[in-house]
Design a protein with these regions (language model features):
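PRPP-associated nucleotide enzymes
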Residues: 1-235
Length: 235
């Protein structure tokens, strides 16, 4: 497994090259173009010929994926995931689900610390699965993911905080027999990027700031996207 990053010491306003500002990213589009440049350097796309696809994680990751796909000249789709939150405290993620997989992927250490069993989370999982199915119907008319067996798949998000939803997406795609998995994001804490090396063949991150509290802090413009926004990006 290969982890490719610019630096683990970026702070706001630092540059990767003389005169070039890296953080904060102006917006998701600019971050996507930067990420595409990094992917061009890091991944041997010629090896896969026409068997490469970019999959964005909704919603914000789709805006980044759109730029990556446009710059690299690749097809794009989405892979829908949902965070499994602690009951009554949904912002605390204890796992995630992704389309194409039957069971959630849990943060085993955290669920053990909290004393949670799958039965404790059954209601939350059911609600998130219903929302996942709703989004698949909206984004892809209810059709399943296109076949990825034997393909190189580049999974793109707008940033990784814990990496829980990305982990679920990667496991789903591995089960679907994707031949080569690349996880790509503009920004992530180094700990999250390293924790996902076992799930992907390559992890490509533009910047891994040493101080990290949220993805949004590393963007000047980080508005929430709607389902309509995602559909427009997929059009």
């Amino acid at each position: 497994m290969v982890l490719i990053v610019q630096s683990s010491g970026y702070t706001l306003g630092m540059t990767s090259k003389p005169g070039r500002r890296v953080l904060p990213f102006p917006d998701r589009r600019a971050a996507g173009r930067m990420l595409a440049e990094r992917l061009t350097e890091a991944v041997d796309l010629d090896l896969w010929s026409e068997r490469t696809v970019v999959l964005g994680l909704p919603r914000g990751g789709v805006a980044v994926a759109r730029e990556v796909a446009a710059v690299l000249g690749l097809p794009m789709d989405v892979i829908v995931t949902r965070k499994i939150g602690y009951p009554g405290q949904p912002e605390l993620g204890v796992g995630a689900i992704a389309e194409g997989m039957r069971e959630p992927v849990y943060d085993v250490r955290l669920t053990a610390q909290l004393g949670l069993s799958p039965a404790d989370l059954a209601e939350v999982v059911a609600a998130e699965r219903a929302e996942l199915d709703r989004r698949v119907r909206i984004y892809r008319g209810g059709s399943p993911l296109p076949p990825v067996a034997g393909w190189c798949v580049i999974v793109v998000d707008d940033g990784l905080a814990t990496g829980g939803t990305a982990r679920a997406a990667l496991r789903s795609l591995r089960t679907a027999q994707a031949a080569y998995l690349v996880l790509a994001a503009p920004v992530a804490p180094l700990s999250a990027a390293e924790s996902l090396q076992a799930e992907a063949d390559q992890v490509v991150i533009v910047a891994t700031p040493s101080r990290f509290s949220s993805v949004g802090e590393w963007y000047l413009a980080f508005g929430q996207l709607t389902d309509a926004d995602v559909l427009a990006l997929l059009d």
